[in-house]
Design a protein with these regions (language model features):
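Bacterial N-terminal signal peptides
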Residues: 9, 13-27
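A residue-level marker of the well-folded mature domains of exported/periplasmic proteins
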Residues: 33-339
């Protein structure tokens, strides 16, 4: 019997066995690496195509996917009970971070985060104090102040309006900052205010938004700022139809009605989502509270080709100076506090 063929065969079989053993040993590690990062996002009422708050969040998630090649799971709720259900299911399916868009998701985040302590949660526009939750909030009153200034600077009647969505402290922040900005320019100006409702349905009623806007226009307002989600689409359409001006909210809505949208109070929701996903992927994500204002580029007013003719160089200069003064602390914008 030839010794060398036998040795060669033995070596081959041993090598194969070692290879199989190594594969079996490393497979779980490789699988774990492949599953190491699985981001997810749960939108609030209105859905990711609301052309406002949720859409801005969606854009942040999509940008992350484009930049990194990492896909994300998402869920659009249609009723309140789905918040908790969706988050729990995403956590069970291996999500490593779940971004909850909107203050109404706070209770669901608090409950599910306790059930899944190893999953990271980021909530936008609310505070949940847990060791695995990051809370991102904005100083909406600062951008609203600038929008109020712009409204007062272009108003011919000295009367402007505000239409909010759900009557909650967050929307009162917008209203108060806006009013202070108006009064900063024209102390004698009138500011009409209406809230759409007291339930989440107030975010998705453009017909009601249009009705409220028409009422304010009828009282003499010639500029209306909305902070009402999809309801605000009706406000903006009513302004265009009446030959008046509107101010968008959350995302840059200038493009919706070029020449009719004075500006938009933009909020870095897309930035917040992108940052949450990116930090979690990089291992730099931290729980706790994060506040974003003008100084952090978290909020601002929008200026582009769609409203360039409405915001004159003189108006822009005044807004730029006010922005610098707010950042420097020379102008104090009141933050609404619930009584």
């Amino acid at each position: 019997m030839d010794f060398f063929p036998m040795l060669s065969s033995l070596v081959s079989r041993c090598s194969a066995a070692l290879a199989l053993g190594a594969a079996a040993f490393f497979a779980p590690a490789l699988q774990a690496a492949e599953k190491a990062f699985a981001p997810a996002i749960v939108y609030d009422f209105g859905g990711k195509f609301d052309r406002s708050f949720n859409q801005s969040a969606s854009e942040g998630a999509e940008k992350f996917k484009k930049d990194t090649g990492v896909a994300f799971r998402e869920f659009e709720i249609t009723n309140a009970a789905q918040r908790e259900q969706a988050m729990a299911q995403l956590a069970k399916r291996g999500a490593s971070i779940i971004v909850a868009v909107g203050f109404t998701q706070a209770s669901a985040v608090e409950k599910v985060a306790k059930q899944f302590p190893d999953v990271k949660f980021t909530i936008i526009d609310a505070v949940v104090d847990l060791p695995n939750v990051q809370s991102i909030n904005f100083r909406e009153q600062e951008s609203s102040f600038l929008c109020g200034m712009a409204a007062a600077l272009v108003s011919k009647t000295g009367k402007v309006g505000f239409v909010g969505g759900m009557d909650i402290p967050l929307i009162r922040k917008f209203a108060l900052g806006y009013t202070e900005g108006v009064k900063f320019v024209n102390p004698a100006a009138e500011v009409f205010q209406n809230m759409t409702g007291t339930t989440p349905a107030a975010w998705g009623d453009p017909t009601k938004g249009a009705e409220l806007a028409k009422s304010q226009f009828g009282r003499g307002a010639d500029v209306i700022f909305h902070a009402a989600g999809a309801t605000g689409i009706g406000v903006m359409q009513a302004a265009k139809d009446a030959g008046k001006l509107s101010i968008g909210c959350d995302s840059n809505q200038n493009y919706l009605h070029p020449g009719s949208v004075l500006t938009s109070a933009v909020k870095g929701v897309s930035v917040a989502v992108y940052k949450a996903f990116s930090d979690a992927k990089a291992g730099t994500w931290k729980p706790g509270q994060l506040f974003l204002g003008l100084a952090e580029n978290g909020v601002d007013y929008s200026l582009d080709e769609f409203n360039r003719k409405l915001i004159t160089p003189e108006i822009e200069a005044k807004l730029r100076q006010a922005k610098a003064d707010i950042i420097a602390g020379k102008i104090k914008v009141t933050e609404y506090k619930a009584q």
